[in-house]
Design a protein with these regions (language model features):
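Short acidic-glycine loop/turn motifs at beta-strand connectors
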Residues: 176, 218-223, 282-285, 365-366, ...
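Long, charged amphipathic helices and adjacent flexible linkers at domain junctions
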Residues: 326-334, 449, 453, 578-602
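Short, well-ordered beta-strand elements within core beta-sheets of diverse protein domains
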Residues: 171-173, 204, 250, 389-398, ...
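Structured, non-catalytic alpha/beta "coupling" segments that mediate domain-domain communication
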Residues: 90-97, 339, 349, 441, ...
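N-terminal beta-alpha lobe that positions the nucleotide/phosphoryl donor
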Residues: 1-277, 281-300
Length: 668
């Protein structure tokens, strides 16, 4: 079959740009990338056949500059532009500009984007077509006092949502009327910053709902079908964490009803291309239209894995005027697929986005059952300007239980050194009963977050001894290698066993874990050690380290661990949990906390959007002092203790670096 286009420009970055390039390459299509100053060495730039610079690192200076992207398309001879997701993917003006330039926009018609791009307008349209809606307000009057009245009429709990937004940006849950004004102002700021549109809609908040969406596809010949559902109920801060298909909640009858509603929604706007109709689903099975995303979704790979399709190829062919490759009756799903999003973020700090160089990155080996969609590689930098996703991990197997087990095995091979990551959080997620039993709802993670975090409890003793053995073997191997380079491989000084004249041969391994510092006394050499820590002894025999595979007998019981080391970090994984330690000098003292409680510092680079702190004002612990924007999210910085504001060293609009002191406190 002939390629639908000879040259396609991808107006995006990261993993989605890389993913589109792979399909184009398979079809023999020449690819053109665009990049910001921050992405000059990014993977999508390296993968494309050619690449054009389009501006500064901030999205509004590059990936949101439609004219710069069109200029790159004209210069490169691109026949079509694939927008990916985010950025300009749901921008009707850009889609229209592409058409006027004679360049195909690989997405829906501009009027379809406009109809569904405003949540308020979309809800009005769905209301006309009989699609169930959650009670609320989606009108044009955006006066604050009027919205407060509509909120009171709708009732609490209430959801405030950006009319033109998505992805959790500009969204707040309000449980009491007195919280409404502050929540509205914060959501409006976030929406204005993220989408250039501060309009809000109000909805009655459905308690403990599920989030289930349907993939739809239409062509220019009037055909519209759905490609089954994806359940995305596992969310944190309104961001999807785990997506799967089929949904463990839907019955065949519910699936048929929701699928028909999704197709009706798409037909209502003469939809062409890939889209997703999202529903809120109550615990009783009732469902309500939430929004339609007029683009390819991040989680589309689970649909591809169960159907054996390439949705990007479908997008390309439909954009070229071809009919849909399959009819509704031809859609046959096979097995179960799950996707997880691996992020540079700190779950223990409210999922604070991270940034920095990926000093070490290990991801699962791709196979027929395991897929990895990544936009970065080891040595790349996760920047502060964009979403901190590292990779998407997708698995497929015959049923849900097998798919979950395959995902656990895939996660066990992951390692991220550099910025903090959510890999350990994901490991706990796929073992949690709420997930394995298929009963999670959209608010479960936020309500029970402590169940998914490691906490500050005692370190596992077996893991501590395994980490110590890994350090011992690593030191011995390094000493032997050095001796060989020196031409004396049999020197007793190269044994790294602690032997010295007049010395008993004890080595001390100091490891910092969640439970504090541990010292492990070790006697022995070459895989046979007598270990002791905090009065507990362990005899280790037959220890070997083959690459990252550590095997040994601990007090006669054979164990196998995955052990990795990078710099002073050592991590061991027993197949169920990972345990990380910092290998410290055995007799080093820990630094004290100093005056950390007297300062409020920037947790990461970002822009100050609001300053509430005033010099001389007495504040209480937890009071809101500043709001900053980083990684496209608003972060509220609060007083670490009660006191008097002594100094304010930040102003709205100012860009600050990580660890910059923003507020100083004195005693009240």
């Amino acid at each position: 079959m002939a390629a639908p286009f000879h040259t396609v420009l991808i107006a995006n970055r990261g993993e989605i740009a890389c993913r589109v390039i792979r399909t184009c390459r398979r079809l023999g299509i020449r690819t053109v990338a665009v990049y910001s100053e921050a992405d000059a060495d990014a993977q999508h730039v390296r993968l494309a056949d050619c690449a054009y610079p389009i501006g500064g690192p901030r999205p509004q200076d590059s990936y949101l500059r439609g004219e710069a992207i069109l200029e790159a398309a004209r210069a490169s001879g691109a026949q079509a532009i694939h927008p990916g997701y985010g950025f300009l993917s749901e921008n009707a003006a850009f889609a229209r500009a592409c058409a006027e330039a004679g360049i195909a926009f690989i997405g829906p018609r501009p009027q379809s984007i406009e109809a569904m791009g405003s949540k308020a307008a979309a809800k009005a349209l769905m209301e006309k077509h009989g699609v169930p809606l959650v009670p609320g307000y989606h009108g044009e009057d955006q006066d604050g006092a009027f919205l407060a009245e509509r909120a009171q009429a709708t009732g609490f709990p209430l959801m405030i949502k950006a009319a033109a937004g998505g992805g959790g940006k500009g969204m707040r849950i309000v449980r009491e009327a007195r919280e409404f004004a502050d929540a509205l102002a914060s959501a409006q700021r976030e929406a204005q910053s993220g989408f250039g549109d501060a309009r809000m809609i109000l909805e009655r908040y459905v308690e403990h709902p599920r989030h289930i969406e349907f993939q739809v596809f239409g062509d220019a010949h009037g055909h519209v079908i759905h490609l089954n559902e994806r359940e995305c109920s596992a969310q944190r801060r309104y961001q999807k964490v785990l997506e799967e298909t089929p949904s463990p909640f839907l019955t065949p009858q519910r699936r048929a009803a929701m699928g028909a509603a999704a197709v009706a929604a798409a037909k209502a706007v003469d939809y062409v291309g890939a889209g997703t109709v999202e529903f809120i689903v109550g615990q009783d099975g009732s469902f309500f239209f939430m929004e339609m995303n007029t683009r390819l979704q991040v989680e589309h790979p689970v649909t591809e894995m169960t159907l054996g399709l390439d949705l990007v190829e479908w997008q390309l062919r439909v954009a070229a005027g071809e009919p849909l490759p399959l009819a509704q009756q031809d859609i046959r799903a096979r097995g179960h697929a799950i996707e997880l999003r691996l992020y540079a973020e700190d779950p223990q700090q409210g999922f604070l986005p991270g940034s920095g160089r990926l000093e070490r990155l290990r991801l699962p080996a791709p196979s027929a059952q395991v897929r990895v969609d990544a936009g970065v590689a080891e040595g790349d930098t996760v920047t502060i300007f964009y979403d901190p996703m590292i990779a998407k991990l997708i698995v497929h197997d015959a049923d849900r239980d097998l798919a979950l087990q395959r995902m656990r095995e895939a996660l066990a091979t992951c390692e991220v050194v550099g910025p903090k990551s959510n890999v350990e959080f994901l490991e706990r997620l796929v073992r949690h009963p709420a997930v394995t039993e298929g009963r999670i709802d959209t608010g479960y993670l936020d309500r029970h977050l402590d169940e998914f975090l490691p906490g500050d409890g005692e370190d596992d003793r077996a893991a501590l001894f395994a980490a110590a053995v890994a350090c011992l073997l690593d030191e011995e191997a390094a000493a032997q290698a050095q001796a060989a380079r020196n031409g004396d491989p049999h020197s007793p000084w190269a044994r790294a066993d602690g032997w010295r004249l007049g010395h008993a041969g004890k080595r001390v391994i100091a490891l910092d874990g969640r439970g504090g510092r541990h010292t492990v006394d070790a006697h022995g050499h070459a895989g046979r050690y007598a270990l002791a820590s905090d009065g507990i002894a362990c005899m280790v025999e037959g220890a070997r380290l083959d690459g990252e595979a550590l095997s040994a007998r601990f007090d006669g019981v054979g164990r196998r661990w995955r052990a990795t080391r990078h710099g002073n970090r050592v991590a061991v994984h027993d197949g169920t949990r990972r345990h990380g330690f910092a290998h410290a000098p055995a007799f080093a003292f820990e630094a004290g906390a100093g005056d950390a409680g007297d300062r409020v510092v920037a947790p990461m680079p970002g822009r100050i959007v609001l300053v509430k702190a005033e010099v001389g004002v007495v504040v209480q612990e937890g009071d809101e002092l500043l709001v900053m924007e980083a990684m496209k999210m608003e972060l509220t910085l609060r007083a670490p203790r009660g006191g008097t504001v002594e100094a304010v060293q930040a102003a709205p609009g100012e860009f600050v670096e990580a660890d910059a002191v923003l507020v100083r406190l004195a005693e009240a």
